[in-house]
Amino acid sequence: MKDRYILAVESSCDETSVAILKNDKELLANIIASQVESHKRFGGVVPEVASRHHVEVVTTCFEDALQEAGIVASDLDAVAVTYGPGLVGALLVGMAAAKAFAWANKLPLIPVNHMAGHLMAARDVKELQYPLLALLVSGGHTELVYVSGPGDYKIVGETRDDAVGEAYDKVGRVMGLTYPAGREIDQLAHKGQDTYHFPRAMIKEDHLEFSFSGLKSAFINLHHNAEQKGEALVLEDLCASFQAAVLDILLAKTQKALLKYPVKTLVVAGGVAANQGLRERLATDISPDIDVVIPPLRLCGDNAGMIALAAAIEFEKENFASLKLNAKPSLAFEGL
């Protein structure tokens, strides 16, 4: 039986990535060209800067991925690409490169939802058992997704305002931490105590929606008022208190979802899934009857490896796109 190879491209935000997947589950290469250093001085991602960086490095990423995988273009069976959600300019660069490569090598094109990629990064750990629930937590999204079968996603809960990763970066900026702030806040939180009271929005309500804008505002107000009064705040305790509130909200809504949708598997994925505090709370708060699957740290952030793992499922369903495929920056899963 011939080996199957899928080349995947990811460029939805500030990472340019090209990966190659063998036989639906073995990642032979996952090249990531990060732009974090370029955006640090701005305190966040600048779309125009991101697009320019993608243009500069995407061709090299293709070459490096093929070389690392030890294959040539003629060995490939398909090309997959993120077509949304994300920054429209950034998406278009990756899509143009993927479509040109697919056309030149007469390969089918597989369209992949970026968030499906995050979710299916869990396939790197084990083959998933359906139905399952997923908590997707990143800089742009916070959502609970019910997955009835391979490639069948439905949103059952999501944030009404800020995404959890966005809240981390905004409070990090207030504290003068380096962008992206999530990892540093997590590290500082482990050295502090939950001594400042922050709100846990809608934590007792039965619905599965999240809200982090009130928590973010409460944090900013506390910090501002302390500055005005010349009061000293303990940075480690601030981080510990903020993170405790975030995790209380995430865990409460996830547990409610598990009661409403009695599944045996919970996937937790996205950039914030790298958070050590979140991983610790999942280990202590989620029933041992639930199989909690979290992608390895190397697949939590944006990368093409996760896009390839999601694309393998779409390949089986023969979900191919024409070369007229356009970017969908606001692409979302279907809601219930």
From Swiss-Prot:
Question: Pfam families from the entry?
Answer: TsaD
List GO terms (cellular component aspect): cytoplasm
Q: What is its main location?
A: cytoplasm
Query: Which UniProt keywords are listed?
Result: Acyltransferase, Cytoplasm, Iron, Metal-binding, Transferase, tRNA processing
InterPro entries given in the database record: ATPase_NBD, Gcp-like_dom, KAE1/TsaD, TsaD
Cite the binding residues for substrate: 136-140, 169, 182, 186, 275
**Which superkingdom, per the lineage?**
Bacteria
Provide the cofactor note recorded for this chain's UniProt entry. Binds 1 Fe(2+) ion per subunit.
Q: Where in the cell is it found?
A: Cytoplasm
Database matches in NCBIfam families: gcp_kae1, T6A_TsaD_YgjD
Family stated for the protein in its record: Belongs to the KAE1 / TsaD family.
**HAMAP family found in the cross-reference section:** TsaD
Protein's job: Required for the formation of a threonylcarbamoyl group on adenosine at position 37 (t(6)A37) in tRNAs that read codons beginning with adenine. Is involved in the transfer of the threonylcarbamoyl moiety of threonylcarbamoyl-AMP (TC-AMP) to the N6 group of A37, together with TsaE and TsaB. TsaD likely plays a direct catalytic role in this reaction.
Question: This chain belongs to which protein, by name?
Answer: tRNA N6-adenosine threonylcarbamoyltransferase
Q: Which species?
A: Streptococcus agalactiae serotype III (strain NEM316)
User: Gene encoding this polypeptide?
Assistant: tsaD
